[in-house]
Amino acid sequence: MELNLEIVTTPLRPAATVVMLRDAPVGLEVFLMKRHTLSDVLGGAYVFPGGKVDAADTEIDMAAYLDQPLRLLHAGLNEADISERTAGGLYVAALREAFEESGVLFAQGFATLDIDAVRAATLLREGHGFNAVLARMALRLQTRSLVPWSRWITPTAPSVMNKRFDTRFFVSAVPAGQVAIHDNHETTDSIWLSPRSALQQYWAGQIELAPPQIMSLAHLARHAAVDSVLSAARGRRPPVIQPEPFDHGGQRVICYPGDTRHSVSEQALPGPTRLSYRNKRFEPDAGFEALFL
């Protein structure tokens, strides 16, 4: 992964990501997709489904198409400085991006619990917008399926891209009976891996990961099952992670809350408090196992 040294002063773009999980014989697994190599955001890297908030995400009739009142969604994010509608839009964006990028539809019918995700995907390909698909199929989005996990704010020195995002990460169990798959447009490959296996493949040079994915996978690796992740997420406030990069001896270092160089002294995530850029990738100074200490 190439290092970006550009300073970016453009406003933050609100975004949302869904970390989809499942229980497998080997334990907890997470869904990752490979961004198209020509993408202007993390091209070639493996990421969780997600993207920026669109205007339509906040324009939807939330009382009709969401399964929870906005006040509960707002409370779940624990962000006093945003409106309830903005909070609702973040949930909608997360669910929309999950569907558009992986084909997984977190929804239920108004009159039945059954949904036809294949038909919904067909309508989307035919040019119907996400909100129109919900209306046409009489679907209500299942915001209860999402639990806020963390909030990542890109610094003005992004290190791996030239855009800045204010991204809310949600965790969720993939719905039973649905198959997550890359869209062959924005993403070109997809895989289910245990968090540790994903990091092992990254360490071996088999896949590329950006720092937020590295740190998130290291966090998830501490859990053995989906219920453990969801329970932990429900039992705490989603931490705000604003990385603070600096250069040390000609080497780019990204530090996180709790690091001696970070402005926030309290550690927000388990694992290392800094990653250093070596061999065209970011890694902890103490080696691979430091991700799990």
Could you say what each language-model-derived stretch is?
Residues 1-293:
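N-terminal leader/linker segments that precede catalytic domains of diphosphate-processing enzymes
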